[in-house]
A protein has these predicted regions:
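Exported/periplasmic ABC-transporter solute-binding proteins
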Residues: 17-52, 67, 71-74, 86-87, ...
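Extracytoplasmic metal-acquisition and chelation regions
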Residues: 74-78, 107-108
């Protein structure tokens, strides 16, 4: 009996001293997505959807002006997927052999004006009502800026903005914070701002559309996953998310 008790005690002590199994340290696969700043809300949502269906994968985003992202790719910045807010910037990327295969058109977007709640400056459109007001637009080198310039020319309006931003989300932020009387943004940004702003339609805005394209970066180290992410964007789930955000589907 004593021997049995000693044996049981020894076994218990041995079990207590045995280290617990080490937690899994398998590294997660990181998928790097470069995307236009106007896609920040929708692509963040798409990233969560993708991670949910791909255990062990983390989607890392870099949101910026499309032209800035192309420059970064040219300089060798590592990325797996690139989504541009207009065709000219994607063309720059493909011409420089930065993309693998043919990028896919997945959405279009148009411009509108946002103003602080109540429209205290009395803005009526992209017209003389913005003269002398604190108007903020995108810089001409980025898609929303190029579209703004085209639309202003179409309407015969000369704009004198107090600030030109490299990201459309920065234009939105300045209106939301009351730093600007009006800002020219995409309709998707106006929808994302919600009750923080009022929206003023721009005449003939539907005549100046920006096309959004997405593709796999040529130097991607995760091209299979990158292609699957692109498939999500252009598939039914991705298109639903984009449509809900206000994008027009191709």
């Amino acid at each position: 009996m004593i021997r049995a008790l000693v044996a049981v005690t020894a076994l218990a002590l041995l079990s207590a001293c045995t280290p617990a199994p080490a937690p899994s340290t398998a590294p997660r696969t990181e998928l790097v997505v470069f995307a236009a700043s106007s896609l920040s809300d929708t692509y963040t949502s798409l990233g969560k959807t993708f991670e949910g269906s791909h255990p062990g994968v983390t989607v890392k985003f870099s949101f910026d002006g499309s032209s800035t992202l192309v420059d970064q790719l040219k300089q060798g910045a590592p990325a797996d997927v690139f989504a541009a807010a207009d065709r000219p910037n994607m063309t720059k990327a493909t011409t420089a052999n930065l993309m693998s295969g043919t990028p896919s058109l997945f959405a279009t977007n148009t411009l509108t004006i946002i103003v602080p709640k109540g429209n205290p400056a009395g803005i009526t459109g992209l017209d003389s009502s913005v003269d002398g007001k604190k108007l903020v637009i995108c810089a001409d080198g980025v898609p929303c800026g190029s579209a703004t310039t085209k639309l202003a020319k179409l309407l015969g309006v000369t704009l004198k903005p107090v600030s030109q931003e490299t990201k459309v989300t920065d234009v939105r932020a300045k209106v939301e914070s009351g730093q600007a009387d009006a800002g020219v943004v995409y309709v998707t940004d106006a929808k994302a701002a919600g009750s923080k702003v009022d929206t003023i339609a721009i005449k003939n805005a539907d005549q100046v559309k920006n096309e959004y394209l997405v593709g796999v970066v040529a130097t991607s180290k995760n091209s299979n996953l990158a292609n699957q992410f692109v498939a999500l964007v252009i598939g039914s789930e991705g298109q639903r998310i984009l449509s809900d955000a206000g994008f027009t589907l191709p």
